[in-house]
Amino acid sequence: MENGSASEGKDPSAFLSEITGAPVTVKLNSGVVYKGELQSVDGYMNIALEKTEEYVDGKLRRSYGDAFVRGNNVLYISAD
């Protein structure tokens, strides 16, 4: 395996601390996507975002100043 591959089972906390304050994409188990600035993530993967946009079926549905996403709904977090 190459260095840094996901199969190594690395702790994601270093990655998450690096991208705090940066634009991210958060996809939920339901397929809804949130894009915004990552403000914080806790050990349960609860996520706080600022300047958040909600996309449903690829289309912008709503914009929020701040949004909180409960961790058990999160499929993935991606740095933009």
Curated annotation (Swiss-Prot):
Keyword Glycosyltransferase: no
InterPro entries: Lsm6/sSmF (IPR016487), LSM_dom_sf (IPR010920), Sm (IPR047575), Sm_dom_euk/arc (IPR001163)
Positions of the Sm domain: 11-80
Predominant place of localization: cytoplasm
Subcellular location: Cytoplasm; Nucleus
GO MF annotation, one: RNA binding
Family: Belongs to the snRNP Sm proteins family. SmF/LSm6 subfamily.
Protein name stated in the entry: U6 snRNA-associated Sm-like protein LSm6
Subunit structure: Component of the heptameric LSM1-LSM7 complex, which consists of LSM1, LSM2, LSM3, LSM4, LSM5, LSM6 and LSM7. Component of the heptameric LSM2-LSM8 complex, which consists of LSM2, LSM3, LSM4, LSM5, LSM6, LSM7 and LSM8. The LSm subunits form a seven-membered ring structure with a doughnut shape.
Keywords, sorted A to Z: Cytoplasm, mRNA processing, mRNA splicing, Nucleus, Ribonucleoprotein, RNA-binding, rRNA processing, Spliceosome, tRNA processing
Taxonomic path: Eukaryota, Fungi, Dikarya, Ascomycota, Pezizomycotina
Cystines in this chain: none
A UniProt-annotated Pfam family: LSM
GO cellular component, one term: sno(s)RNA-containing ribonucleoprotein complex
Free-text function comment from the UniProt entry: Component of LSm protein complexes, which are involved in RNA processing and may function in a chaperone-like manner, facilitating the efficient association of RNA processing factors with their substrates. Component of the cytoplasmic LSM1-LSM7 complex, which is thought to be involved in mRNA degradation by activating the decapping step in the 5'-to-3' mRNA decay pathway. Component of the nuclear LSM2-LSM8 complex, which is involved in splicing of nuclear mRNAs.
Organism: Ajellomyces capsulatus (strain NAm1 / WU24) (Darling's disease fungus)
Any single GO BP term: mRNA splicing, via spliceosome
